Design a protein with these regions (language model features):
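Nucleotide/pyrophosphate-binding catalytic subdomain
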Residues: 1-223
Length: 223
């Protein structure tokens, strides 16, 4: 049985030891194969601030807040995701006798994404097209390397960076990356560890929290 676990950057910052202990306990039972996919938004911001740089966020016309990942920010994302977070997770798991193997989605071209070279944002209530964007949308996951690692009793730990169609490193949404990994590997269980309360029917209405939902109901909401 295979479990794919997504770890959000906020949990790496706040509940690191508990997350590692839980993963180690599952791994040591030898009943499940595990794959971990992680993000690192807070750590990207932390590194930017250490460099006296401010994270760049914009509102989209649809009302969402989005990170603007320019050439400078993607360099920091590589350090935060592929360096700091990934190796910290691997180190902690190894200390718990978990044979973790860490890498990013661009290694081996495992996670493929379509780069968003420009994004439409609101600046002073005006629609502006921001170019030079180094984020992407996951479109495919190659499984050969992952299956090799799993077959040899390694636990893959994947940072949510991906390879664009032109070979550029792009920052991708960790949740989407993890879901694509789970689908590509035909995972039996997908677990998302996050610091949010759950799914909201209307995000602005805190009383609209959905505590339990089936896959069919979720598809209807996303339709």
């Amino acid at each position: 049985m295979l479990i794919v676990i997504k770890i959000g950057g906020a949990l790496i910052a706040k509940n690191f030891d508990n997350v590692i202990n839980d993963i180690a306990n599952i791994y040591m039972k030898k009943k499940y194969k595990l794959v971990v996919v992680h993000g690192g938004g807070p750590q990207i911001n932390e590194l930017l601030e250490e460099m006296n740089k401010s994270p760049k966020y914009f509102k989209t016309p649809s009302g969402y807040t989005t990170r603007y990942t320019d050439q400078e920010a993607i360099k920091v994302a590589i350090m935060a995701l592929g360096g700091k977070n990934n190796k910290r997770l691997v180190e902690a798991m190894q200390k718990h006798n978990v044979n973790a193997f860490g890498f990013t989605g661009i290694d081996g071209g495992i996670i493929e994404a379509k780069r968003k070279e420009k994004i439409l944002v609101l600046v002073d209530d005006k629609r502006i097209m921001k170019r030079g964007e180094f984020s992407g949308k996951v479109v495919n996951v190659k499984t050969e390397v992952l299956n090799f690692l799993l077959d040899n009793e390694y636990l893959p730990v994947i940072a949510s960076l991906a390879k664009s169609e032109d070979g550029d490193i792009v920052n991708v949404d960790g949740d989407r990356a993890a879901s694509f990994v789970a689908k590509a590997l035909n995972a039996d269980i997908f677990i998302s560890l996050t610091d949010v309360d759950g799914i909201y029917k209307n995000f602005d209405d805190k009383n609209s929290l959905i505590k339990k939902i089936t896959s069919t109901q979720l598809k209807n909401y996303l339709a």
